[in-house]
Amino acid sequence: MKNISFSIISFFIIAFFVTACVPPEYNRDKFEGTSIDFSDKQVQDIYNLLERQSADTLMKYLSSPNPTLRYVAATAFGSLKEKKALDSLAILLKDEFVDVRIAAAYAMGQIGEVRAENILLAAFEKHDTIGTFAKFNATIMEAVGKCGTNARLHDLCSISTFKMTDTLLLEGQAYGIYRYGLRDSYNVESIQKMKYFVENQGFPPSVRLIGASYLSKIKAKYDTTVTTSLSSITLSERNPEIRMALVKTLGKAENPLSILPTLLSLFRKETDYRVKINILNAVNEMPYNSIQPLLFSALRDRNIHVANTAADLFVKNGTEQDAQSYKMASSDETLQPSTKRLMMGAALKWLRFYPRTRDSLNNAMKELYVKTANPYEKAVLLRGLANFGWNHEMLRAEALKTENAPVVRTAATEALAKIICSPDFYRMFQGYSMGVKNQLKAALFDIINSGDAGAATVAAETIIKPEAELNRLRMKEQIPELYQVLQRLKMPAQLEAYDAIYKAIVKISDSTTIKKKKFTTPRSIDWITLTSMTDFSNALIKTSKGDIKLRLLRQNAPISVANFVNLAKSGFFNGKTFHRVVPNFVVQTGCPRGDGYGSLDYTISSELTPMHYNTEGYVGMASAGNHTECSQWFITQSPTLHLDPNYTIFAKVLEGMDVVDKLEVGDIVENVTIN
């Protein structure tokens, strides 16, 4: 390596000369931080300060003579994202212990201040020839991606001398470019760099995955030159996690029909349901006639998530010409029940030219709604009934029925929101449009006043949506009643409702001076539970579809692990439903209401560390923003790198991913045991 004088501005040019070898036994899934002794009272104090978000007191540990305490404190600031800690963290970039340096660099990136850019660049170990600082240098590159200027994106893309065996450095470079992309900072150069990573099989799979995820995530559209090249790569790609990202990328072609043959060919031979789902979503905006055979074929797929994805696309993008076919599918006994319910909604939406058939189906759906006792089946039917706007009175009644399950009330409100925001609103109601609009506005305010956490959240979000076209001036007189609702909410359990109503007040009043209250209610960390565990403690989740075994990541997220263990031992999770399933993304549970808007009377801190959601099976804490976590958690079904900076990872699936992939909305957590 050449010895070149260091310059901050030319940092990444100097980085061209960096070489580092990564041992082949490097384990990407293992967090390589200092081992933490949770019986240490000072360690406990740091986590207690994190839980209380006491940044000022926590900062004293950044100068502790104990490297473990410096490390734990620096990591904590990656969760707090406290700007005032920046200078103290900068000192740790020269710490004698590399783990402390890594934690400090990560935290500085999390803080996101542009002035950290030059500080981070100056700390890059440019003379590291044996890889001692490879992970540290990689962390710096990713951190710059979170806080750097656009000029540094060019420098980051220009690095070309890392060897294909320099796994950590290549990951850092790729993650840095990816983080820029999440900030909507991308260009031809960054696209070409990530495309280069993807197209060359010699690069580590982890780097190729980051590149493919980047291309699928940024908002760019791709010309024929890019999509033609990626099409051949996609067809031959053996890694399904890379393949599913490439499929999503192809769906962003400037000329969508040019890549349709590739996607159709891939769908026919594809065995991974996740890739099939991405193919269906990729063809979503193509002309209906070109994808109609594919969608009807997918309705009969053996995987329920593939079939239901196809049904959803018929709802969104169907045609009047095929409406009768949708109705026939809704009663086809060879289709799965949940698929048939979705096809009812598709038929109801598109049977515009067949009023008698539509009315008959509408009545049948209402009868089925009354007959079924399953609240999640009721919710699907209510959303389907929204496809005929004249059902609004029935939907209002269901949203306000206190005897209805929370998920039903929320779904009814979502259905009303769909009607009032529909681009077909005026076509549907014609001369009655303004009268119906006023009725819907009144219904939404009634729902907000009901105080139901889920329904009120949806209603408050809806009244200020531009597509709802509600006159803000005429709503100003209702601001006092919105304030009254805020006062009645139970905090922090109804935090999402508070946030939605607060935003509605700000929007309607046209004011930027209204202060928002903070409602974090930290709970004392159960150190007895944590110290009685080991780093190999597991959780066994028995569900209605089978068992899932988790490794609890105590070293990575002790607060979240202790919270999860205590809820499990108390029996809290027993009988809870998987209320949210987004195919090829996450399955989520732990909501006391069963609709995703429930919580308990406390919050816990986010624990954001350098771990990545870089494969399936990571278990994270759901939240309504940092430090609002409580009882809800999710399991990923595929790599979800965009979640890294904001969602705690506290466990990893060891066994039972096949069960995770089978879960549907309404499936049950029977019990959770800790081993």
Residue ranges and their predicted role:
Residues 1-31:
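Bacterial Sec-dependent N-terminal signal peptides
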Residues 22-31, 49-63, 82-94, 113-127, ...:
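Amphipathic alpha-helical scaffolding segments comprising HEAT/armadillo-like alpha-solenoid repeats
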Residues 30-52, 68-82, 91, 101-114, ...:
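Structural detector for internal amphipathic alpha-helices that build alpha-solenoid repeat scaffolds
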